[in-house]
From Swiss-Prot:
Gene: plsY
Function field: Catalyzes the transfer of an acyl group from acyl-phosphate (acyl-PO(4)) to glycerol-3-phosphate (G3P) to form lysophosphatidic acid (LPA). This enzyme utilizes acyl-phosphate as fatty acyl donor, but not acyl-CoA or acyl-ACP.
Stated name of the protein: Glycerol-3-phosphate acyltransferase
Annotated catalysed reactions: an acyl phosphate + sn-glycerol 3-phosphate = a 1-acyl-sn-glycero-3-phosphate + phosphate
Location in the cell: Cell membrane
Enzyme Commission code: 2.3.1.275
Organism of this sequence: Staphylococcus epidermidis (strain ATCC 35984 / DSM 28319 / BCRC 17069 / CCUG 31568 / BM 3577 / RP62A)
Membrane association type: Multi-pass membrane protein
Gene Ontology BP, a term: phospholipid biosynthetic process
Amino acid sequence: MMIIVMLILSYLIGAFPSGLIIGKLFFKKDIRQYGSGNTGATNSFRVLGRPAGFIVTFLDIFKGFITVFFPLWFPVHADGVISTFFTNGLIVGLFAILGHVYPIYLKFNGGKAVATSAGVVLGVNPILLLILAIIFFSVLKIFKYVSLSSIIAAISCVIGSIIIHDYILLAVSGIVSIILIIRHKSNIVRIFKGEEPKIKWM
């Protein structure tokens, strides 16, 4: 029972719409009506500016990061294969990612999983996050597309999990990669059409 409570709480924390709250509270803007219409960090930068964008990014990362430690804080007993699986920090963090992307508060239409996924990886393996960040910013430097950089970093995580034989990481990163591709479908189409806006700060 406690495991279910932990997973639901992880989802609800992940579903907290940081970008929407910051936009309405300080800018009187519903960011869903601007830019890409997304509530995540990238659109927050675009619509609300850098300071607000950094705050939203931090909050979205923190949502994923904190949930990784729930198995340590909740009185759960992993005495079987199933309970052990669902008390793994990556699995608990995945529920936060799902909450971020499909928030119950916003009719299941939220962010694109990037920042919250980064928070989960930070909590589980900071070195892995550093490697993925290097890949992300390298691709961003070359192509100037945040969407493309996010997808390539996620796929790199899948490849890395295969190399190190971490099959829970493989499952989670595989699910996140699929979600990322689905959520960035319109971005991918615009890239092929040459219509996707490029960043100008790098």
